[in-house]
């Protein structure tokens, strides 16, 4: 038999197999049921799925019930579909003032008290760079206020600012500091936007082990005027008045489950399918008086994709195992996924791929926008799955937005796991996106449900292609996460 004929036969067999997979998804997919999940998760009943509101328990319970009903199982040793997370809810102070020399900063206007207890007094100031261990060398900060630049070198995305700050608080406390002030000097993210978002109750992972934290403060210093004055000794002390600070402990829930693969060897590897199920809750009413931010696009549609995948793969398990994850508190700083990445219920080196979902909206129903397309060897599998349902996969059209590093996938990419985000189709961050993004208008009634169905089905097929692939997905050569990936998986 000629090589050409052999190749044609092989291609025909492969094409038949792919078509069979698509047909299997089509026949198993209950469109009305999927849309009913969508309507419930984006309903007023859940009050915008804010992790600090009691309705969030109903959302997590609903997702776990679907996992159980469809046949996904609890992870060994968990005795639950939940990964409980110790959160700390810190409300703004009733009074917040920090005076540096002749300049007084007031809460919400140049000052944000983000965490910690009340504090009143006059304290010495010590500048310690970015607040990392090496920055403390030769410096006595006991009983003083540590002053640092916000974020960390080359880590200035919004998510990075929060994660770096949490690390700094712990280190400053161990060094004996009474408070941490970060000077906010990131002009790319306007202070007014930051203040509007953060001058409200803040949620963090509680790493205090029952001990009291220290005040964590941001001061507006876009021109580095204040931090330079402190560093030169022109300003040596701060008068601090933080009163009425309330901190409360609550429990958050990641919803997790697995479906075991069929291959005796490959079933020890996991394809993680994830989406955050929280949103921003209740806020400022729009012109129609609607104050519930339902979050259909962001990210009920993604949560439903994971629920649909649970149903399909429980009845049609692939060669590799499937790890299903619905994250909490993405909107609070990627907290749920971050907690899992540091406290994994499955060894990270066994998670060979993360197909994450997060969304702000869509403006093109002929495409799927894959944030991270072009960075892993699994690209053709995703592109083919999307094409099989009549759509086209495109890469990030707005790299200046830094979307890859603003969603849950980045917590796993940093560990070395290939992790693109499978998003609704958008070609730019235009008015069609912003009129729904974090707005009360983001509800199911304004969503193209025919497009949602294609999106959900293509997600399942993409996951199936990866889970059945004979090769293990890798980062493309030269990617910034390639080296850490080789460490994780033990590759040369």
Residue ranges of each PLM-predicted region?
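Bacterial Sec-dependent N-terminal signal peptides
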Residues: 1-25
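Soluble metallo-hydrolase cores and metallopeptidase-like ectodomains found primarily
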Residues: 22, 104-107, 112-138, 204-295, ...
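Second-shell loop/turn segments in exported
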Residues: 22-28, 44-54, 69, 86, ...
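Catalytic-core environment of secreted peptidases
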Residues: 26-46, 51-74, 138-140, 144-151, ...
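Noncatalytic luminal/extracellular "stalk/propeptide" segments of secretory-pathway proteins
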Residues: 47-145, 152-154
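Extracellular/luminal Protease-associated
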Residues: 107-208, 260, 397
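Metal-dependent peptidase/peptidase-like ectodomains
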Residues: 214-225, 318, 327-431
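His/Asp/Glu-rich mid-to-C-terminal helical/loop segments that flank catalytic regions of hydrolases
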Residues: 311, 315, 430-491
């Amino acid at each position: 038999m000629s090589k050409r004929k052999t190749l044609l036969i092989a291609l025909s067999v492969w094409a038949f197999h792919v078509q069979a997979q698509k047909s299997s998804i089509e026949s198993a997919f209950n469109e009305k049921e999927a849309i009913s999940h969508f309507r419930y998760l984006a309903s007023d009943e859940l009050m915008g799925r804010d992790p600090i509101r009691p309705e969030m328990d109903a959302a997590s319970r609903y997702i776990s019930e679907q996992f159980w009903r469809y046949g996904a199982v609890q992870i060994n040793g968990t005795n639950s579909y939940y990964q409980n997370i110790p959160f700390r809810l810190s409300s703004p102070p009733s009074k917040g003032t920090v005076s540096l020399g002749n300049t007084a900063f007031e809460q919400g206007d140049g000052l944000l008290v983000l965490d910690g207890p009340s504090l009143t007094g006059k304290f010495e100031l010590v500048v310690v760079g970015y607040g990392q261990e090496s920055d403390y060398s030769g410096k006595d900060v006991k009983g003083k206020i540590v002053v640092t630049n916000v974020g960390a070198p080359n880590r200035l995305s919004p998510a990075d600012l929060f994660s770096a700050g949490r690390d700094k608080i712990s280190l400053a406390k161990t060094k004996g500091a009474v408070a941490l002030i970060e000077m906010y000097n990131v002009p790319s993210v306007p202070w007014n936007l930051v203040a509007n978002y953060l001058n409200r109750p803040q949620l963090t992972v509680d790493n205090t082990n029952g001990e009291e934290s220290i005040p964590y403060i941001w001061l507006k210093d876009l021109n580095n005027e204040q931090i330079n004055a402190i560093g030169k000794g022109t300003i040596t002390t701060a008068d601090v008045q933080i009163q009425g600070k309330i901190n409360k402990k609550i429990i958050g829930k990641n919803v997790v489950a697995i479906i075991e693969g069929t291959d005796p060897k490959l079933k020890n590897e996991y394809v993680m399918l994830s989406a955050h199920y929280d949103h921003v809750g209740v806020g400022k009413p729009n012109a129609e008086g609607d104050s519930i931010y339902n979050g259909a696009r962001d990210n009920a549609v993604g949560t439903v994709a994971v629920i649909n995948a649970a149903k399909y793969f429980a009845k049609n398990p692939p060669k590799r195992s499937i790890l299903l994850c619905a994250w909490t508190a993405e909107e609070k700083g990627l907290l749920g996924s971050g907690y899992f990445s540091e406290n994994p219920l499955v060894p990270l080196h066994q998670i060979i791929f993360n197909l994450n979902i997060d969304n702000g909206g869509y403006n093109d129903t002929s495409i799927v926008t894959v944030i991270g397309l072009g960075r892993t060897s699994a690209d053709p599998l995703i592109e083919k799955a999307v094409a099989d349902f009549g759509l086209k996969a495109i890469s990030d059209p707005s790299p200046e937005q830094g979307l890859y590093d603003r969603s849950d996938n980045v917590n796993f990419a940093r560990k070395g796991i290939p992790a693109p985000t499978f998003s609704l189709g958008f070609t730019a961050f235009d008015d069609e996106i912003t009129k729904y993004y974090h707005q009360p208008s983001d509800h199911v009634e304004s969503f193209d449900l025919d497009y949602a169905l294609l999106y959900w089905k293509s997600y399942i097929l993409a996951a199936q292609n990866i889970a059945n692939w004979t090769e293990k997905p890798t980062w493309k050569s030269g990617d910034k996460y390639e080296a850490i990936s080789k460490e994780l998986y033990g590759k040369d």
